[in-house]
Structures are given as structure tokens and as C-alpha cells.
Amino acid sequence: MDLKEQDYYSIIQRKFVELFESKGCKAYLEITANKRFSNKLKSKISDYRHIIFYFLKDVAPDITGFFEKGSFTDFVIIEVKDEEIKLDHIYQVRKYADLFEAKFALLVSTKEIPAEIKALSKVVYPVLSAPSIYQGRTLVYFDGETQSFKDWYPENPFEKELYWQ
């Protein structure tokens, strides 16, 4: 069975909710590839930041949401690609991350992460950098056959305690 990109959304959404819950967080993720955001999601955006939705009318992350731990609420955006990751995909995810001030921006591909992208991120540091050490910008290889995450670059944020303190 050949799956299309949108067929992966709910699978990946569920997998990430499980990962956030494994870190003791309450997670809410919704599929937003249709450029529609629920009132529940919008209610977590500060009033002064609602202007971001003007810029999301034409393009939006595939999956958008937030997670709560204690009194903190942080945003997460997930972009899914059923093709090899390209540099333009990374900048697309960065744009969404900046608009939402996302703690985590994840670019998930059903193809292995290209060695060239990994090499580029080592010589052009800003490619995967985040505004803060407490924010993660991560490339992820999702194996559709086993329905599992196989590779995280530069690191798996769910295994780094710095993000969860």
C-alpha cells in the first residue's frame, strides 16, 4: 500500500503525542495542513500575536500544537514530507517555528536524512539553529513500514533533559 504524505499526518501526530506524554506533558496536536486552526489552539496564542494567522492563510504547518508541563505551555510545529528533505523544507519549518515561537520545530520525512543536509548544517550553523538553547530544530526520519522514528538530527529532543527542565 502506497501512502501519500497526508496519510502519515495522523500516525505521526499520535506518535508525537505519545512522546510528549512520556515526558510527563499534556500534549495537544492538530492537523493544520488545511490552514484551519481550532479555537483551542488559537486560545493559547497571546492576543498581540494573533497577527500570525494572517500569514498562515496561504501556508501552514502540517501539524501544530502545544504541550503543557506544570504552568508552562510551549508550541510545537511538525512538517511532514513524503520525499527527501531539501534545504527549502528546513527554511519552511523555520518560518513556522518563528511565527509560533515554537519550542520544537520538527521536519519529519519518510526518507532518510540526506548526508548533504547533515554536512551543510555543520558548516552553515544557522541552518538548524534555534533562538535559544531551550528550543529544538530537528530533522526526523520516519520509517513508514515500521511506523517508527529511525533517525533524529542533530539529536532526539526527547532524550535531552535540557529541554524538559
Predicted feature locations:
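Nuclease catalytic cores
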Residues: 1-30
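Active-site metal-binding core of divalent-cation-utilizing nuclease and nuclease-like domains
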Residues: 26-74, 85, 147-162
